[in-house]
Amino acid sequence: MSFVFRYRARVFSPLLVVLSALGGCAYVTPEQPRAPALPVLAKPAPFTAADAEFVQTLNTMDLAQIALAKSATTQAGRSDIALLGATIAKDMAAVQARLAKVATVHTLSLTDKPAPAEQKRIAWVQRAHGAVFDRRYIRYFASAYARIKPVLARQVATGTDPTVVAIARDVQTRLADYQAAMR
């Protein structure tokens, strides 16, 4: 009996495999429906002339702040001003890098030096040391903050490029924190 069983298994096993394979070929799959067209990608927010002007204004302010903050680390009379200067230099350099990315994307050129009038004010502050430097630096920072504050607020309210608006918000909060720390 075992011989007969083995014989049947040898005959029927390949037969079952062939029949099941042929059965799978007999079924014709219906044609797949066509994929719908891809939706149009959302266009990036427009980069307006106001955005470009803001990026350039913030760039010149950042350059001046970085130059004076680096001076504050060595010339400040108070240690808190020196530490704050190091923080401002690091943070504004990061903002500068973000502005450079935005400028590259939108083919905008940024200056690498502050305006000549700002350079004179920076040189005037940098000539001092100790407590005199602290007073001049705090006064300069307060006046620069007063000048840039409405520009930042306007950009946050009316800016069209979300990256530029995010930079404006970030700088707005950082400058307010620095101003509070200097008092």
Question: What are the residue ranges of the model-derived segments?
Answer:
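His/Met- and acidic-residue-enriched segments that coordinate or traffic transition-metal cofactors
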Residues: F3-V4, C25-R183
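Sec-dependent bacterial lipoprotein signal peptides
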Residues: M1-C25
